[in-house]
């Protein structure tokens, strides 16, 4: 979608980040072209004065839409859909359905991505801890258990087609699988396959992002 006289929204991102990928997939799903800026976390580019001026929380993704600054992927994704999408399929206007999409996105940040952050990103990536104890896996197992139940008898998390709920959650769980496979959760397994097949940008952005995450974290391709 092109708006005359307006520049493309700028997205600061890193491909290893599931939230960043969810925004790339959301934009792809509505046909929105972004001016993407890769932020190198290893070089601490997210902590430079220039970036901190944009986002003092120094998180990715961060959006600059012609001077309007927004961070947190769930906030960005809903904003982009409401402003640029041709319809409300990804974020339904119906109050009940929208509330369910919101609920599922809160589940992503409060369970799936939270588990990844607590078990892996903070202690191992940032603090140098060596390895993961099996006893720490309960957060992932519990998140899988809940998501498996949420998908009972359904193809998508909310409604009859994919929404922002599916996009956010699948970007997280496809990365979490590197830590804990979900082979024993049939609903999740089939849902991830549907997401890969149907969600625009999944093959272009999410699959390479998961692989890059694996390489950076030195995880074996056969999973842990």
Each model region followed by its residue ranges:
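Short, flexible helix/strand-to-coil boundary loops that buttress conserved ligand/catalytic motifs
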Residues: 55, 74, 116, 151, ...
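Short, hydrophobic secondary-structure boundary micro-motifs
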Residues: 88-93, 114-116, 157-160, 202-207
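GST-like domain detector, emphasizing the conserved glutathione-binding G-site
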Residues: 2-134, 223-224
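C-terminal helix/juxtamembrane-tail motif
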Residues: 207-224
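Active-site-flanking alpha-helical
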Residues: 81, 172-173, 205-206
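GST-like fold's C-terminal all-alpha helical module
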Residues: 104-197
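Conserved beta-strand edge residues that scaffold enzyme active sites
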Residues: 41-42, 165, 209
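Charged phosphate-binding loop/patch that engages nucleotide di/tri-phosphates or the phosphate backbone
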Residues: 194-197, 201-212
């Amino acid at each position: 979608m092109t708006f005359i006289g307006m520049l493309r929204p700028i997205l600061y991102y890193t491909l290893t980040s599931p939230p960043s990928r969810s925004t790339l997939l959301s934009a792809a799903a509505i046909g929105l072209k972004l001016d993407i800026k890769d932020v190198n976390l290893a070089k601490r580019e997210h902590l430079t004065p220039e970036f901190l001026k944009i986002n003092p929380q120094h998180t990715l993704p961060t959006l600059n839409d012609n001077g309007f600054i927004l961070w947190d992927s769930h906030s960005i994704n809903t904003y982009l859909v409401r402003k640029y999408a041709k319809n409300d399929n990804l974020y339904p206007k119906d109050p009940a359905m929208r509330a369910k999409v919101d609920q599922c996105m809160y589940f992503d940040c409060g369970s799936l991505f939270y588990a990844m952050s607590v078990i892996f990103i903070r202690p191992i990536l940032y603090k140098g801890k060596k390895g993961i104890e099996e006893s720490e896996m309960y957060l992932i197992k519990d998140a899988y258990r809940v998501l498996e139940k949420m998908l009972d008898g359904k193809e998508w998390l909310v409604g009859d087609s994919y929404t922002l709920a599916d996009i956010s959650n699948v970007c997280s769980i496809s990365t979490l699988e590197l830590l804990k496979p979900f082979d024993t959760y049939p609903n999740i397994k089939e849902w991830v396959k549907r997401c890969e097949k149907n969600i625009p940008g999944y093959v272009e952005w999410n699959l390479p992002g998961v692989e890059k995450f694996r390489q950076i974290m030195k995880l074996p391709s056969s999973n842990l």
